[in-house]
Amino acid sequence: GVEQIITVDPHTTYMMREIYPKYIENYDIKVKHYLEILSQKSENLAQFRAGETPEAFVIHDPCVMTRDLGIVEQVREVGGALGIKMVEPENTKMDTACCGGPVEYAFAHLTHQISGIRIGELAGLKSNILVSCPICLINLSRYEKSMGIKIWDMGEILSDLKSC
């Protein structure tokens, strides 16, 4: 049987790690977000550098990843090991502001209001924004053209690593 699942989405990690065990009898699968695993091996990442990426990013912490899972420093550890410079916005880490994505299907207008506030805060610091959640990526990417910014996912950066 399956012993461990590695996820790329904090929402999936939360559901499979925190909710499924409450409802599925004998559920004993270990569930980890990929950044939890990579941060434990960050010394191995030092031999790589991010490929064609900007010099610095403003970091957006996914709300579910930080508040519900406690995954906060891992993205910073992985980014730091790759030589990525990260700028912290005012609302960061456990106090991060949501991108609005989790409520999109029920309250689309509310999602746009929330994401508009968050993207204004982030874009005011840097034009390159780093996320580590596919929902944040999709939700914040809608502002790329109108605001002249670029939203990057950590997985995207990891897929283009170069040896030092």
Q: What are the roles of these predicted feature ranges?
A:
Residues 1-164:
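Iron-sulfur cluster-binding electron-transfer modules in prokaryotic oxidoreductases
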